[in-house]
Amino acid sequence: MAGHSKWANIKHKKAAADAKRGKVWTRLIKEITVAAKLGGGEFDSNPRLRLAMEKAMDANMPKDNIQRAIQRGVGGLEGANYEEIRYEGYGLAGAAIIVDCLTDNRTRTVAEVRHAFSKHGGNMGTEGSVAFMFTHCGQFLFAPGTPEDKLMDAALEAGADDVVTNDDESIEVTCPPNDFGAVKAALEAAGFKAEVADVVMKPQNEVSFVGDDAVKMQKLLDALENLDDVQEVFTNAVVEE
């Protein structure tokens, strides 16, 4: 099955995240803390914690930092109490945006998110206003040149929902979010290591932006991404370089 070209977009986002490693670590520490608080400190029985720990290790976070975040989550260390909040809104041309936050001050966070939207030509929506345009799923992206037939066989046998070959020949595998860990383990056991693997809100349809509109849309997305309380930004906007 064919799909949109997204390898460049994914690699650009990954490079930008690598350039802000300190901020990435801060976000991951929050995620590990909340995951441990909600599901316990044993990663074998806590898929969310396991995923957060894998991301932290991929980001070269020291093990001591990871363990302290887990201990803080299960009550062994003092620290801020974070709550999860999701905001929804619109960018240029009605592009849908989901902003997932972890915050210890809801009033501060909503003000900052609203300001970012309004400053860059977007606006916040109500709860549920755009979430229906996305599918909650596990997502794996493999580099162009990955053996398509072998990957498809391994993915479907592992419990994946779909395998899509994009226009740039990268391959995308999706699965139910609860099966993410099992599918990831099965794919790696079959010799397939994804460049990107995460549980995401995947847009059901995409809106492409070029030229000045692409620049404006990227500024809005960057403004949201750069907020301290923001963990993830999902959008159906595809910003063409």
Curated annotation (Swiss-Prot):
Subcellular location: Cytoplasm
Recorded GO CC terms: cytosol
Keywords: Cytoplasm, DNA-binding, Transcription, Transcription regulation
MF term (GO), any: DNA binding
Pfam families reported for this sequence: TACO1_YebC_N (PF20772), Transcrip_reg (PF01709)
Listed GO biological process terms: regulation of DNA-templated transcription
Xref: Gene3D superfamilies: 1.10.10.200, 3.30.70.980
Entry annotated with the keyword Mitochondrion: no
Domain of life: Bacteria
Family: Belongs to the TACO1 family.
HAMAP family named among the record's database cross-references: Transcrip_reg_TACO1
Name recorded for this polypeptide: Probable transcriptional regulatory protein Rmet_0785
Organism, as annotated: Cupriavidus metallidurans (strain ATCC 43123 / DSM 2839 / NBRC 102507 / CH34)
